[in-house]
Swiss-Prot record:
Main location: secreted
Record's subcellular location: Secreted
One Gene Ontology cellular component: extracellular region
Stored Gene3D superfamilies: 1.10.530.10
The protein's name: Probable transglycosylase IsaA
One term of GO molecular function: hydrolase activity, acting on glycosyl bonds
Task performed by this protein: Is able to cleave peptidoglycan.
Signal peptide: 1-29
EC number: 3.2.-.-
Length: 233
């Protein structure tokens, strides 16, 4: 997803301190007081706010890793961009904001939607930038639906399981949906010769996987013992 819009003096109030535009200073999350949880929530659930305005005035360059995802927020004081991607490099969301016109394009399950917007600008030579298709999977802002570059999805059952996992672990449902899509393509009865099985492809030591509830319980046990590292994050 790639968007362009004229930079505004409005900013999402995040309690982030930084440097004025033009200083060229690049601040990482460790250098400033960044509300990481709020930035994560904006990236997953309030992308319209991130596209409407930078997270603060002036130039900034903020990067951090949380719950298996790398988050990036940058601005040169005039244009701004944000993105988040899985630790293994699969891009989950991306926005590059600059100029006056923008075109939004993203995948939501199997449906492709587009939104266009035109704003007044003092720059008469700004061109709209359309969304590229290089990202490996995209998430909608209203569900945990995920589609990988190879076509894998979490499916309806997997998306429901991802929501339950989010409630039981505190890890975003979109993360669990991505894991399910990658590990089993949303197939409840998926089995690997290594012994891994179910939506989450857990090993027998974490418990039986005959039902979806058992698969969720096994995944919770694996997460509590090893975190997202149990799935390579």
């Amino acid at each position: 997803m790639k968007k362009t819009i004229m930079a505004s003096s409005l900013a999402v109030a995040l309690g982030v301190t930084g440097y004025a535009a033009g200083t060229g200073h690049q601040a990482h999350a460790a250098e400033v007081n960044v509300d990481q949880a709020h930035l994560v929530d904006l990236a997953h659930n309030h992308q319209d706010q991130l596209n409407a305005a930078p997270i603060k005035d002036g130039a900034y360059d903020i990067h951090f890793v949380k719950d298996g995802f790398q988050y990036n927020f940058t601005s040169n004081g005039t244009t701004w961009s944000w993105s988040y991607e899985a630790a293994n490099g699969q891009t989950a969301g991306f926005s590059n904001v600059a100029g006056a016109d923008y075109t939004t394009s993203y995948n939501q399950g199997s449906n492709v939607q587009s939104v266009s917007y035109n704003a007044q600008s003092s720059n008469s030579n700004v061109e709209a930038v359309s969304a590229p298709t290089y990202h490996n999977y995209s998430t909608s802002t209203t569900s945990s639906s995920v589609r990988l570059s190879n076509g894998n999805t979490a499916g309806a059952t997997g998306s429901s399981a991802a929501q339950i996992m989010a409630q039981r672990t505190g890890v975003p449902a979109s993360t669990w949906a991505a894991i399910i899509a990658r590990e089993s393509n949303g197939q409840v009865n998926a089995y690997n010769p290594s012994g891994a099985s179910g939506l989450f492809q857990t090993m027998p030591g974490w418990g039986p996987t005959n039902t979806v509830d058992q698969q969720i319980n096994a995944a919770v046990k694996a997460y509590k013992a090893q975190g997202l590292g149990a799935w390579g994050f």
